[in-house]
């Protein structure tokens, strides 16, 4: 038994399921998860000392690579001045100014401690600002574990939301409407059936929680137009895409201006940070200037702000975002070419520094319904074959994977060499 397996067995005695976030348990791929002892650059090292090329990156935050000197030094310096004050600091101002500079639609910014806090607060603000109760999300899009967002589609576009987790009252979930990602008709139908009742649309501009699904041409433009016509706010949940698909986030990449934006992951540089922001007239509705309440003991934590600021300053140095995107594109194209070589049908999607692949004979994958048709068992097999060869991909067919600036030609070529061998094994098993 490996040390990771021993630790997993031990963890299950005191930690529910042995993990502090469900996907880490490898439930989506089977087997026992690796326990990480340390990480550096593009590599993580498990409890047995084995190194893996890491394409999870702590689920997105580690965009510079692990243990980056600039972030490490910023954290140490800030920690030496105190870990938390519960009072305003100048660092909060410089961080907010940098975020607004990079993301112009965020005229004002409120810092929080997680992506879930950010989306939860943005939705409360949208409801308070518009005076409407209902919200719209998309099937397969995840916006954190707030009750109103743990809702699935039901039996059709016009069906009221049903909870997708026990503990969420059905009466509460009925205020969440679910449309089909990349389908503007489903959005229009919901607005027609709920005229004047919908406060906002919240959407991942690139859906990263049903693997990696980019928008089809005109989808976000259509959402912007519909929200303008209906008096609803458009919220871009950029917790995953923020600063990862482009320097000015997915909204800059696709040239769309949302009313509110939520951020997380990259903005903290590995520390627990989230943020939401947007139009000044909307943000003025948040306490203490407005009636919509939101607060947090550790919001704007000085150590976390220092880490996030250092991360964004390095990331936005000239050429870095292009290098990240080029590296990811090379990897994604390599996966596709190797799958074709071995006669394995596959769709590979990539935007900026995120990518995903689907074992499917479909031409494209653009919605949750498409994802559900993919070969999950083949993904599980591929994941474990790659893991044995020292490549750590997202342990779920429904999660995107990520590169970092620390991933260089050496790591990409090693990954593709491993993939070539793994595809060959899978092809031989299906003949």
UniProtKB/Swiss-Prot annotation:
It catalyses: (S)-4-amino-5-oxopentanoate = 5-aminolevulinate. Keywords: Cytoplasm, Isomerase, Porphyrin biosynthesis, Pyridoxal phosphate. It is found in: Cytoplasm. Its EC number is 5.4.3.8. Its main location: cytoplasm. One of its GO terms (biological process) is protoporphyrinogen IX biosynthetic process. InterPro entries: 4pyrrol_synth_GluAld_NH2Trfase, Aminotrans_3, Aminotrans_3_PPA_site, PyrdxlP-dep_Trfase, PyrdxlP-dep_Trfase_major, PyrdxlP-dep_Trfase_small. Homodimer. This is Glutamate-1-semialdehyde 2,1-aminomutase. It comes from Aliivibrio fischeri (strain MJ11). The lineage of its organism: Bacteria, Pseudomonadati, Pseudomonadota, Gammaproteobacteria, Vibrionales. The gene is hemL.
């Amino acid at each position: 038994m490996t040390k990771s397996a021993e630790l997993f067995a031990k963890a299950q005695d005191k930690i529910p399921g042995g993990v502090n976030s469900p996907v880490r348990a490898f439930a989506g791929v089977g087997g026992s998860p690796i326990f990480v002892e340390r990480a550096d650059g593009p590599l993580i090292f498990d409890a047995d000392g084995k190194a893996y090329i890491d394409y999870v990156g702590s689920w997105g935050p580690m965009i510079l690579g692990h243990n980056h000197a600039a972030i490490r030094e910023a954290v140490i310096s800030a920690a030496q001045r105190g870990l938390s004050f519960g009072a305003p600091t100048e660092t909060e101002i410089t961080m907010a100014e940098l975020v607004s500079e990079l993301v112009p639609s965020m005229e004002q910014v409120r810092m929080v401690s997680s992506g879930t806090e950010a989306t939860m607060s943005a939705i409360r603000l949208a409801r308070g600002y518009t005076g409407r109760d209902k919200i719209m999300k998309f099937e397969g899009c995840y916006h954190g574990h707030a009750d109103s967002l743990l809702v699935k589609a039901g039996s059709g576009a016009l069906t009221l939301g049903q909870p997708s987790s026990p503990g969420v009252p059905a009466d509460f979930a009925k205020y969440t409407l679910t449309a089909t990602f990349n389908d503007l008709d489903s959005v229009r139908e919901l607005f027609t059936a709920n005229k004047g009742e919908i406060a906002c649309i919240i959407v991942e501009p690139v859906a990263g929680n049903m693997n990696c699904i980019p928008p089809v041409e005109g989808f976000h433009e259509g959402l912007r137009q519909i929200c303008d016509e209906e008096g609803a706010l458009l919220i871009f949940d950029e917790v995953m895409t923020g600063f990862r698909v482009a320097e000015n986030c997915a909204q800059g990449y696709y040239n769309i201006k949302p009313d509110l934006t939520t951020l997380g992951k990259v903005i903290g540089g590995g520390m627990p940070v989230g943020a939401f922001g947007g139009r000044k007239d909307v943000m003025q509705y948040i306490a203490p200037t407005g009636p919509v309440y939101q607060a947090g003991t550790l919001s704007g934590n000085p150590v976390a702000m220092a880490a996030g600021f250092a991360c964004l300053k390095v990331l936005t140095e000239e050429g870095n975002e292009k290098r990240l995107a080029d590296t990811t594109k090379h990897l994604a194209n390599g996966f596709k070419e190797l799958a074709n070589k071995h006669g394995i049908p596959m769709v590979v999607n990539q935007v900026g520094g995120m990518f995903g692949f689907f074992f499917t004979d479909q031409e494209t994958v653009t919605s949750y319904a498409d994802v559900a048709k993919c070969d999950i068992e083949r993904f599980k097999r591929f994941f474990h074959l790659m893991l044995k060869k020292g490549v750590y991909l997202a342990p779920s067919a429904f999660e995107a994977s990520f590169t970092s600036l620390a991933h260089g030609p050496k790591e990409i070529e090693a990954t593709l060499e491993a993939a070539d061998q793994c595809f060959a094994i899978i092809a031989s098993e299906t003949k």
